[in-house]
C-alpha cells in the first residue's frame, strides 16, 4: 500500500533544498548563531580543518552545513568525504574545509551541533528501521528542530509524516471535544467533523485520531459513506492512539468483517517502543509513528581538527 506519510519530496527541488526547507534551514542557522555570541577568534591565516567522526553513524545535514558555510564562511571552500545518508566509520573524515581560520572558528560550534544532532537522528532512525521487521516507521510533529528533524528521519529511512500543521488535515481528540454541542457526545462530534471534511482539498491525506475500537469503526464508516457520496475512493488514516498492538489487531479484524478495511490506512501510535516492534508488525497495521526516533536522541560525536597553515 502506498502511504501518504512520506512528504520528503516537498523538501527537495531538483537536488537542492526546496523553498520550505531552505527557509527552515536559514531560521535555525540564524537563531543558533545569534545565541552563540562570541568575540572574534582565530586569525587570517589560511588553514585546513577536518571534521572527524568519533563513532560510527549515518551522516545527515549536508544541505544545512553547506548553507552555513556559503553564507557565513564565504571565503572558505569545502569538500565532503561522506555523502548524505552514508555510514561513517569511527575516526573517518566527514568533511574538509579550507579557508580563513577566523571564519571557521566563528561557526565551529554551531556547525558541530547541527551536523552532530541531525546525524544522531538519522543514525537512531536507521537503527529503528533495521529492527522494524518491514513495518514502515514515521515520526510525528513532536519535534525539537521542526523540518530539520523530519529531514533527518527521512535520511535514516523513516517517513516524515506531516511536515507542519497545515500539510494535511488531522482531527484529534481535542478537535472532537471542542465540537461537542449541547446534547451531543464524542461520537456525534466524530461523525459531524468527518462529514464536514472538504474532500477536494483533503481527501488524499487526512488523519483521524481514535481512542478505541468503537471510534475506529465509526470513523471508518463515516469516511466510507462520504467517499461513496463523492464518488471517490481515497483511504483515511486512522491513528490508533495508545491502543497497543493487541487492540490494533481487533480493529483490523472488525474493519475486515464490515468490509471497511479498504477505506483505511491504520497507524499505530503512542507508547511505541523498539523492543515491541515485532508485535506491531504482526498486528495488521500499515505503519507505526513515534517521536522516539528524533526526540532526546544522542548526537553523533564529531570533532573538528585544524591542521594549521597550508
Model-identified regions with their sequence ranges:
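Short glycine/proline-centered loop/turn elements that form peptide/ligand docking sites
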Residues: 274
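Conserved phosphotransfer cores of two-component systems
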Residues: 258
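Short secondary-structure boundary segments
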Residues: 242, 270, 292
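Active-site loop ensemble at the mouth of alpha/beta enzyme cores that anchors a bound cofactor
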Residues: 303-310
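Acidic/glycine-rich phosphate/pyrophosphate-binding loops and surrounding catalytic core
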Residues: 1-237, 246-250, 265-268, 278-279, ...
Amino acid at each position: 500500500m502506498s502511504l501518504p506519510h512520506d512528504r520528503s519530496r516537498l523538501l527537495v527541488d531538483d537536488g537542492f533544498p526546496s523553498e520550505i526547507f531552505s527557509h527552515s534551514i536559514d531560521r535555525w542557522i540564524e537563531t543558533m548563531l545569534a545565541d552563540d555570541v562570541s568575540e572574534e577568534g582565530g586569525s587570517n591565516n589560511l588553514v585546513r580543518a577536518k571534521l572527524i567522526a568519533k563513532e560510527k553513524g549515518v551522516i545527515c545535514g549536508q544541505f544545512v552545513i553547506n548553507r552555513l558555510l556559503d553564507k557565513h564562511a564565504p571565503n572558505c571552500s569545502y569538500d565532503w568525504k561522506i555523502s548524505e545518508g552514508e555510514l561513517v566509520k569511527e575516526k573517518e573524515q566527514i568533511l574538509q574545509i579550507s579557508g580563513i581560520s577566523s571564519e571557521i572558528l566563528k561557526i565551529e560550534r554551531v556547525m558541530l551541533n547541527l551536523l552532530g544532532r541531525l546525524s544522531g537522528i538519522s543514525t537512531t532512525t536507521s537503527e529503528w528501521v533495521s529492527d522494524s521487521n518491514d513495518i514502515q516507521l514515521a515520526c510525528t510533529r513532536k519535534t525539537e528542530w521542526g523540518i530539520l528533524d523530519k529531514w533527518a528521519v527521512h535520511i535514516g529511512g523513516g517517513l516524515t509524516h506531516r511536515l507542519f500543521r497545515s500539510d494535511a488535515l488531522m482531527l484529534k481528540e481535542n478537535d472532537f471535544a471542542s465540537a461537542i454541542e449541547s446534547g451531543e457526545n464524542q461520537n456525534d462530534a466524530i461523525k459531524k467533523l468527518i462529514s464536514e471534511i472538504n474532500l477536494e482539498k483533503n481527501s488524499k491525506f487526512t488523519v483521524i485520531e481514535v481512542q478505541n475500537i468503537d471510534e475506529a469503526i465509526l470513523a471508518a464508516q463515516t469516511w466510507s459513506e462520504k467517499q461513496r457520496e463523492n464518488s471517490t475512493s481515497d483511504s483515511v488514516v486512522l491513528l490508533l492512539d495508545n491502543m497497543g498492538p493487541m487492540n490494533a489487531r481487533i480493529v483490523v479484524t472488525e474493519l475486515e468483517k464490515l468490509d471497511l478495511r479498504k477505506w483505511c490506512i491504520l497507524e499505530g501510535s503512542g507508547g511505541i517502543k523498539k523492543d515491541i516492534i515485532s508485535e506491531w508488525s504482526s498486528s495488521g497495521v500499515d505503519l507505526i509513528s513515534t517521536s522516539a526516533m528524533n526526540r532526546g536522541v544522542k548526537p553523533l560525536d564529531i570533532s573538528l581538527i585544524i591542521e594549521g597553515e597550508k
